[in-house]
């Protein structure tokens, strides 16, 4: 997937257009697993719509496997699980797969798709009787029926419980092992941290970061020191090193570039106990990057 200088604007009731995306550029190689992150309104869904050919850029270009998005869709080179798009509740899972299978030039066997999506046991169940997680697996099965090289997943685990999310990502790992390119948007940062090889972060329609999750966590070069305190509240002016402090009752969370010096001081000169030092999580990096660019 090659996205070059892409911007997308929409008309609004006011005189000013809404700029959903502004000069976005990146490339995704075959076989990569990429997590697309961003706050609400960051432009994630708009970007997916552009890659799928559901809308066109105001400026810039997008190519998919060397073709236009429309050509890639016609050749069944892209499969997608989107937030929108209903299923027919009265049809069984098997009949749904058969109906959509007939629209592809070279579909995968329905039995193989059902096995990959873990639908074997519910093929004869009406879709309307399926749970939310089961319906999402049906959508995933429809996405891979055409044997695509690329999978786009827009909030694929929204509405799933923890067990259903775990099962879904186990299925995605198997898809990745087959060499498919997987691009997914999620608001579960833990999912992106665990599954994505690379993170693309959008904020207010602009590209804020494009790196491995480990690189994003190391973005600030700082560490987080957390501790509980008895008695006198912590006084930031007494600390031997600069730290950003968040206090809540007898608990303090401090971000600093010199965690060893800070920890030694806290343990020797304050009532601190249950002290921990950790690196930034992906969530910490996400909050820092979106806050600093607002």
Listing of model-derived features with the role each one plays in the protein:
Residues 39-43:
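Walker A (P-loop) phosphate-binding loop of ABC-type ATPase nucleotide-binding domains
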Residues 52:
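Helix-to-loop junction immediately C-terminal to a conserved catalytic motif
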Residues 60-70, 74:
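Conserved ABC transporter NBD signature motif
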Residues 98, 102, 108-123:
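Conserved ABC ATPase "signature" region
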Residues 151-155:
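Catalytic Walker B motif of ABC-type/P-loop ATPase nucleotide-binding domains
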Residues 170-256:
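ABC transporter nucleotide-binding domain
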């Amino acid at each position: 997937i090659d996205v070059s200088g892409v911007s997308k604007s929409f008309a609004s009731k006011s005189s000013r257009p809404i700029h959903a995306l502004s000069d976005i550029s990146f490339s995704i190689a075959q076989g990569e697993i990429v997590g697309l992150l961003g706050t609400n309104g960051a432009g994630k869904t708009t970007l997916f719509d552009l890659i799928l050919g559901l809308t066109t850029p105001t400026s810039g270009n997008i190519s998919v496997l060397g073709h236009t998005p429309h050509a890639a869709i016609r050749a069944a080179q892209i499969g997608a699980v989107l937030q929108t798009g209903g299923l027919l509740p009265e049809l069984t899972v098997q009949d749904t797969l058969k109906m959509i299978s007939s629209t592809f030039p070279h579909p995968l066997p329905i039995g193989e798709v059902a096995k990959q999506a873990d639908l074997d046991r519910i093929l004869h169940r009406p879709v309307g009787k399926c749970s939310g997680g089961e319906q999402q697996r049906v959508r995933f099965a429809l996405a891979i029926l055409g044997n695509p090289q690329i999978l786009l997943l827009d909030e694929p685990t929204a509405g799933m419980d923890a067990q259903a999310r775990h099962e879904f990502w186990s299925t995605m790992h198997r898809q990745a092992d087959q060499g498919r390119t997987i691009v997914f948007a999620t608001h579960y940062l833990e999912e992106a941290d665990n599954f994505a090889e690379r993170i693309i972060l959008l904020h207010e329609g602009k590209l804020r970061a494009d790196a491995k999750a480990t690189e994003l966590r190391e973005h600030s070069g700082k560490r987080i020191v957390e501790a509980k305190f008895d008695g006198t509240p912590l006084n930031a002016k007494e600390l031997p090193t600069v730290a950003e402090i968040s206090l809540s009752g007898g608990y303090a969370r401090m971000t600093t570039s010199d965690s060893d010096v800070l920890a030694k001081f806290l343990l020797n000169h304050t009532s601190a106990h249950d002290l921990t030092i950790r690196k930034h999580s992906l969530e910490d990096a996400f909050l820092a990057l979106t806050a600093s660019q607002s």
